[in-house]
From Swiss-Prot:
GO terms for molecular function: DNA binding; DNA-binding transcription factor activity. It is found in: Nucleus. InterPro entries: AP2/ERF_dom (IPR001471), AP2/ERF_dom_sf (IPR036955), B3_DNA-bd (IPR003340), DNA-bd_dom_sf (IPR016177), DNA-bd_pseudobarrel_sf (IPR015300), LEC2-like (IPR044800). PROSITE patterns: AP2_ERF, B3. Residues 1-37 are annotated as: Disordered. This is Putative AP2/ERF and B3 domain-containing protein Os01g0140700. GO terms for cellular component: nucleus. It comes from the Eukaryota. CDD domains: AP2, B3_DNA. It comes from Oryza sativa subsp. japonica (Rice). Keywords: DNA-binding, Nucleus, Transcription, Transcription regulation.
C-alpha cells in the first residue's frame, strides 16, 4: 500500500507539466522501479512525506468497493489487501474491482484455508483440488508476490500442467532462441535490458511495429519461466529514441534476485511443442566464471612465514 500511495504523489507532481505520453510512461516506469528497490523504512518515510503533499482533491471521492479486501485508488484503479495478525498485506493494484476481488480471494484461501470468507461464496468450493494443492505448495510470500506481479494465473496454469509443486521445464523440452551477455548498462541503474533487434523481431511472439501506438506507449507484457519454474513478467517495448527493443518493468527485480553482473549471460528459449499444450517463453542465467585463476594460484601457492610474515610470497615487481 505504501508503494501505491507514493506513486500517487509522483503522479501528482509529474502531471503538472506538458510532457508527452511516452515521457510520462518512461518516468512512470522509472518511479515504479525506484520504489520497488527501496527498503521498507525508506519507503515509509517517502509515503509519510507524500501524504503531507497530497492535495485535498486526491481524497477518496469514489464509494468504497462492494468487495471484501478491495479499496479504490485515486488513480482510478483498485487495490487489494488482506490482514494477517493485525498487519496489512498489500496484494497489488488492479484495473477493476473484480480482478482485485479475485486477488483477495486467492490470498484468503492461502492464508486461511478452505474456510476463508471470500467475495464469492463458492470460491473455496469452486477452487479445484489442483489449485488448492498449488497454493499449499507455495509460501504465503510467494503467493503474494505472484498476485502483485499479476503472474498468478500463468503460474497456476503451468503448475497444473506439471503438478502442484512448480517444476522447471526440462532441458529436452526447451528450444533455444538466443543468448546475450549483459552489459554494465543492462544490469545498472537504467533498469532495462536491450534485446538484440534481429532476435527480438524474429523470436518474440508480439513483435512491436516501430511506429505503432503500442511501441510508443507502454508496450506489451511478456511472461518468462526461469530455470526454477518461477514466472517473471517484463514489459517489452520499442524505444524510438534509441531505436531499440527493451525489457523494462520487472527487469531490475530479476537482476537483483539472480545477482546478475556484467559479463553474465541471459539465455532465452521456448518450450517445445511436445511439452504441454501451450508454448511459453523461458529465461535462464549463466554466470561468468570469475577468479578461477586466482583460486588455482592460491591453492598451489606455498606459504612460508617468519614471525608472521609470508616470506615465500610473489616478489615480482
Amino acid at each position: 500500500m505504501e508503494q501505491e500511495a507514493a506513486m500517487v504523489v509522483f503522479s501528482c507532481n509529474s502531471g503538472s507539466g506538458g510532457s508527452s505520453s511516452t515521457t510520462d510512461s518512461k518516468q512512470e516506469e522509472e518511479e515504479e522501479e525506484e520504489l520497488a528497490a527501496m527498503e521498507e523504512d525508506e519507503l515509509i518515510h517517502v509515503v509519510q512525506a507524500a501524504e503531507l503533499r497530497l492535495p485535498s482533491s486526491t481524497t477518496a471521492t469514489r464509494p468504497s468497493s462492494r468487495y471484501k479486501g478491495v479499496v479504490p485508488q485515486p488513480n482510478g484503479r483498485w487495490g487489494a489487501q488482506i490482514y494477517e495478525r493485525h498487519a496489512r498485506v498489500w496484494l497489488g493494484t488492479f484495473p477493476d474491482e473484480e480482478a482485485a476481488a479475485r486477488a483477495y480471494d486467492v490470498a484468503a484461501l492461502r492464508f486461511r484455508g478452505r474456510d476463508a470468507v471470500t467475495n464469492r461464496a463458492p470460491a473455496a468450493e469452486g477452487a479445484s483440488a489442483g489449485e488448492l494443492a498449488f497454493l499449499a505448495a507455495h509460501s504465503k510470500a510467494e503467493v503474494v508476490d505472484m498476485l502483485r506481479k499479476h503472474t498468478y494465473d500463468d503460474e497456476l496454469q503451468q503448475g497444473l500442467r506439471r503438478g502442484s509443486r512448480a517444476q522447471p521445464t526440462p532441458r529436452w523440452a526447451r528450444e533455444p532462441l538466443f543468448e546475450k551477455a549483459v552489459t554494465p548498462s543492462d544490469v545498472g541503474k537504467l533498469n532495462r535490458l536491450v534485446v538484440p533487434k534481429q532476435q527480438a523481431e524474429r523470436h518474440f511472439p508480439f513483435p512491436l511495429r516501430r511506429h505503432s501506438s503500442d511501441a510508443a506507449g507502454k508496450g506489451v507484457l511478456l511472461n518468462f519461466e526461469d530455470g526454477d519454474g518461477k514466472v517473471w513478467r517484463f514489459r517489452y517495448s520499442y524505444w524510438n529514441s534509441s531505436q531499440s527493443y527493451v525489457l523494462t518493468k520487472g527487469w531490475s527485480r530479476f537482476v537483483r534476485e539472480k545477482g546478475l553482473r556484467p559479463g553474465d549471460t541471459v539465455a532465452f528459449s521456448r518450450s517445445a511443442a511436445a511439452w504441454g499444450t501451450e508454448k511459453h517463453l523461458l529465461i535462464d542465467c549463466k554466470k561468468m566464471e570469475r577468479n578461477n585463476l586466482a583460486t588455482v594460484d592460491d591453492d598451489a601457492r606455498v606459504v612460508v612465514k617468519l614471525f608472521g610474515v609470508d616470506i615465500a610470497g610473489d616478489k615480482t615487481r
